[in-house]
């Protein structure tokens, strides 16, 4: 599965149609448009994808490439008009021409099939994304959730125990 995120659906369709026309041997590849889906499906689809495609000229502040990198999904993308600081050749495959996306994607697919994708691409992407992730906040939230769960269970247990003690005394 190739997850794809563009600003306009026409751009998405242009990439997909051009890819299938130019490389019919890859007709078995499924594309998934990532615009307008809920957060749970979004993360699920990113995990299932073997590569993400991002084309957005207008915004250099889109989080889609970072979310892809965080889920260890390599990114192929067009460099936006305002290039973000985190975007470099180590953490993704970037081009200045949207027309090159299809050729780069085909080459990436071929390398993926031949198992020629460097682990460095995955590692650098995760390293880049981790700069923007608040892991401590996430860990704190998870720890608090489990502690609250334990406290509620403990209160229920103590309540049941106190009821039994009261019944014994009577």
Model features per residue range: what roles?
Residues 57:
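Aromatic "clamp/platform" in nucleotide-sugar-dependent glycosyltransferases that forms part
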Residues 1-42:
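Conserved catalytic-core segment of nucleotide-activated headgroup transferases in glycan assembly
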Residues 113-168:
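A charged, aromatic-enriched C-terminal amphipathic alpha-helix characteristic of glycosyltransferases
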Residues 44-49:
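Short alpha-helical donor nucleotide-sugar binding micro-motif in glycosyltransferases
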Residues 43, 66-70, 84-85:
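Short alpha-helical segment that forms part of, or immediately flanks, the ligand-binding pocket
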Residues 50, 72:
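A short alpha->beta transition loop at the rim of the catalytic pocket in nucleotide-sugar-dependent
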Residues 74-78:
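Short hydrophobic beta-strand element within catalytic cores of glycosyltransferases
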């Amino acid at each position: 599965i190739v997850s794809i995120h563009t600003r306009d659906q026409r751009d998405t369709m242009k990439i997909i149609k051009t890819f299938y026309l130019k490389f019919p041997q890859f007709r078995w590849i499924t594309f998934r448009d990532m615009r307008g889906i809920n957060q749970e499906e979004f993360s699920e689809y990113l995990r299932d994808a073997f590569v993400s495609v991002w084309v957005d000229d207008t915004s250099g502040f889109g989080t889609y490439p970072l979310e892809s990198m965080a889920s260890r999904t390599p990114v192929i993308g067009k460099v936006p008009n305002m290039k973000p600081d985190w975007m470099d050749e180590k953490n993704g495959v970037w081009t200045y021409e949207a027309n090159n996306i299809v050729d780069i994607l085909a080459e990436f697919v071929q390398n993926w099939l031949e198992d020629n994708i460097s682990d460095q691409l995955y590692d650098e992407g995760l390293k880049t994304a981790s700069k923007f992730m608040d892991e401590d906040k996430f860990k704190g939230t998870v720890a608090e959730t489990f502690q609250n769960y334990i406290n509620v269970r403990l209160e229920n247990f103590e309540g049941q125990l106190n009821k039994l003690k009261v019944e014994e005394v009577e």
